[in-house]
Regions:
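N-terminal Rossmann-like NAD(P)+-binding domain of SDR-like oxidoreductases, especially those catalyzing
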Residues: 1-149
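NAD(P)-dependent short-chain dehydrogenase/reductase
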Residues: 4, 97-106, 128-199
């Protein structure tokens, strides 16, 4: 992973926490980590998760998000004591598709996938690999299709944090008699389901 630990610094010093650096794009790194720890469960949250960035860096997005998942699954397949595996999938896999049985309903497991970005394609590949390894190699693998989820640790490149950060900046600028640039957002017609990270 990247060396940025700012979002987990609150438990870095906890006596039961031991940070092991790894790289999902390097099978040897995954092998060393999993064989050192011998976990009961593995949660793959690794991804290059910015849709916009995925258009600028499709290879990086694929290598981390899709190939990284496959690398983890391959290491688990070769382990004697196989841990359970969870893949964090994304609602981006659906693209603009509706529920097959009722267009008024939200997307669910009956909705066709129609990815619209390199990120969504990579997530769909990881999702599909997890299903394949469950069926073909008898690995306990499952995926959760996550929609947008928010918390105080959400990066400031995401829309909710952009808006809340802008409101705070605007407040302080107004107090100090300063002007700040206008807030710039992307597609204002986009519809999303949001939840809190603790609910996931």
């Amino acid at each position: 992973s990247t060396p940025n630990t700012s979002r987990i610094k609150h438990f870095l010093t906890h006596k039961q926490f031991h940070l092991i650096q790894g790289d999902v794009t390097d099978s040897g790194s995954i092998y060393r980590c999993l064989n050192e720890v011998q976990p009961d469960e593995v949660y793959n949250l690794a991804a290059q998760s910015h849709v916009g960035t995925s258009f600028n860096q499709p290879n990086l997005t694929w290598n981390v998000t899709a190939q990284g998942c496959l690398n983890i699954l391959e290491v688990i397949r070769d382990m004697g004591n196989r841990p359970r595996f969870y893949q964090a999938s994304s609602s981006e896999m659906f693209g603009d598709q509706y529920n097959l049985y009722d267009k008024e309903k939200y997307q669910d497991e009956h909705t066709y996938f129609r990815p619209q970005s390199p990120y969504a394609i990579a997530k769909l590949a990881a999702h599909s690999a997890t299903m394949l390894y469950r069926r073909s190699y008898d690995i306990f693998g499952c995926s959760g299709i996550l929609f947008n989820h928010e918390s105080e640790r959400r990066g400031e490149r995401f829309v909710t944090r952009k808006v809340t950060r802008y409101v705070a900046d605007l407040y302080w600028a107004t107090q100090e008699g300063r002007m700040i640039p206008k807030l710039q957002l992307g597609n204002l017609n986009a519809k999303r389901d949001w939840g809190h990270a603790e609910d996931y």
